[in-house]
Amino acid sequence: MYCDSFFMSRLLSLAQLSGSSWSSICLVCVTSLVFWRIKIAVTQYIRLRHIPSPSIFAAVSYIWLARTTYSGKQYWIHRDLHRQHGPLVRIGPNEITTDDPEILKKIASSGSTYSRGTWYLTGRFNPYHDNLFTILDPFAHKKAKTRSMPAYLGRDTPGLEVIINDKVKQLISILQRRYLAVLPGQDPPLVDLGLISNYFTMDVITHLAFGHQVGYLQDEKDHYNFLGSVRKLWPQMSTSADVPWIRNILFSRPVLRFLGPKHTDKKGFGALMGAAKQHVDRRFDSGEERKHDMLESLMKRGFTRQECEIEGLFLLLSGTESTACAIRQILVHVITAPSVYAKLKQEIDSTCQGRGISYPIQLAEAKRLPYLQAVIYEGIRMRPPLLGLFPKVVPEPGETFHGQFIPAGTSICTNGSSLLRSKSLFGADADLYNPGRFMELSKERREEMERNVELAFGHGQWMCAGKTIAFMELNKVVFEKHCQFFRAFDMQLHSPLKPCEVESYAGLIAKPPAKSSDLSMISRVTDMSRGINPCYRYPPQYRTHLKTHMLNVPSGSNFIRMPIVLPST
C-alpha cells in the first residue's frame, strides 16, 4: 500500500512539473492504468503460482484461454492437459481446471457451499429475470430447482415420453417418405442427418416447453434462422464467456437491455422469443385444455408467464445442440466400428424377434438392452456434448486438493474432455472406442463407470436439469434409427479417413460442407432385406417389390451416405 501511494505521488509531482497540460494528465492516467494492471497480474500470479499451467500466458492473463476457445480445438487441447500437468491445472489468472471425479462430486454435494462463477451469467438473455442456469447462489438455486424439477423428471408430465415418441415417429416417417420414395429416373434426394438431428431436438424441446412445435422437422427448415445464427456466433460467444471482463460487459443487464435479443426481432433468437411468448400467452389467457406437458407443470407450481418463457427458452438453448451433438457422435462411432455395428444389430434383432417391443421403444425397455446402453454411454464418453468450464467458486477459508492449497475465491472448472478419457477410470484403452468395456464388468463396477460418464451432465445439486429428457431422446433415436435403418440398409461412409469434421466451442459443432455439390456417389448396394421383423412396417407403396436406392448426404458435415434397400413383404 505504501509503495502504491509513493508511486502515485511521484507521478503527480511529475505532472505538476511538466505543467497541467492535457498530455501530462493523459500520461499520468495511462501510466497509472498500466501500473495498476501489472500489480493485479503479479498478485494473481503469486496466489496460484504453485499450480502448473500450460503457458505463462495462462497464469497472468486470459490470452491462452481465449485463444484455445476461439481456435475451435478446445476439446482436444483440454483433453491432454491433465496427462501433461497433473490433476490440477491453471488455465487463467483465477481459474483452475480438474478432471478428478472426487473433487467434482465434493463440490456438487448437497452440503457444499461452493457457488457458481459468473461464467454462468452467459446463459442470461433476459435483463430482468434469471433462469435456472444463471442463479449463482447455491441455496437460491436449490430452491428454484426444487420448484421446477417435477417438470423435467416427468412427475407432473405424464405426456413427456408421449411427445418424444411422436417426434421419433415423425423423424422415421420423414426419412422413409422423403428419402426413400424415389421414382424411376429421378436422382436420389440428399439427407443431412446432422442437421435433421438438430431439427428433431428443436421440435422436441419447443413442444415440451411451450406446448407447440415450431415445425423444424416437418418443414426441414431452420425457422427464424435460429440454428444458423447460433452456429455463426458460437466462436465469439464462447470466447466471450471464458474471458471475465468481456462477459461482465456483454452479459450485463444494461447491455442486454439495449443490445440483447427482443421479442420483436424478425430472425435469430429474438424471433424465437417472440414465438415462445405467443404460445405461453395463449395458454395463460385462453385456459387451453390440460396437456400434461412441462408448461402446464410450471404453471401449476406458480411460475409467472415470463418465468415460463425464460425457462422454456433456456431449455431450448441448452438442450438442442447438445443432444443433437450426442446423436451425431454416437451414430458416427457405431458406423466406423464394424464389430460394434454388428453386435448392436444383433441385439436389436433378437430383441424384436424375442418379445414385443413398443414403437417407438419405451425408455424402460431400452434400459434393459445392455449393449444399446453401452453404445450410448461410450458415444457420450468419446465426445461429451457439453464442454463448458462450469466454474465453481471456492468458499472461505479455502480448500486443499492433492496437497495443494486453493485460496478462497478461486474458480475450479470441470474438464469433461479429460475426465471422460481418464485411463484410471475407463482403462488403459480409454482413447479407443470400445462399448465392450461396459459389458466386461460386474454390475456394481458397470454402474460406477456409467455414473462417471454421467458427470458430463454435472452432479448433485448442479446436475443438468434436462438429463432425463436427453437420455430419453438418445435411447429412442439411437434404437429406432438402428432398427429402422441399420437393420434394413447397409451404410457406408462418404469419407472413411475423415467421416465427420467438427469444431469445439463449449460443445462439438459439425462444420457445414464447403459447397452443396461436395459429395461423391457410392455404387455398391448390399441386400439386407432378409430377416427384417415385420412389426416394423413400411408404407404400402414400398411393399410391392424390392427397391434399391442410394441415400446421400453432403460431404463434411454429416459423415454418412447410405445405400438403401427396401424389404419386400
From Swiss-Prot:
Heme binds at residue 464. Keywords: Heme, Iron, Metal-binding, Monooxygenase, Oxidoreductase, Virulence. Induction: Expression is induced during the early biotrophic stage of development. Expression is positively regulated by the ABA cluster-specific transcription regulator abl7. Its cofactor is heme. Its EC number is 1.-.-.-. This is Cytochrome P450 monooxygenase abl1. It comes from Leptosphaeria maculans (strain JN3 / isolate v23.1.3 / race Av1-4-5-6-7-8) (Blackleg fungus). Belongs to the cytochrome P450 family. The gene is abl1. Disruption phenotype: Impairs the production of abscisic acid (ABA). Does not affect sporulation, pycnidiospore germination nor fungal growth rates in vitro, and does not alter the pathogenicity of L.maculans. Cytochrome P450 monooxygenase; part of the gene cluster that mediates the biosynthesis of abscisic acid (ABA), a phytohormone that acts antagonistically toward salicylic acid (SA), jasmonic acid (JA) and ethylene (ETH) signaling, to impede plant defense responses. The first step of the pathway catalyzes the reaction from farnesyl diphosphate to alpha-ionylideneethane performed by the alpha-ionylideneethane synthase abl3 via a three-step reaction mechanism involving 2 neutral intermediates, beta-farnesene and allofarnesene. GO terms for molecular function: heme binding; iron ion binding; monooxygenase activity; oxidoreductase activity, acting on paired donors, with incorporation or reduction of molecular oxygen. It holds the Pfam family p450. PANTHER family: CYTOCHROME P450, CYTOCHROME P450 MONOOXYGENASE.
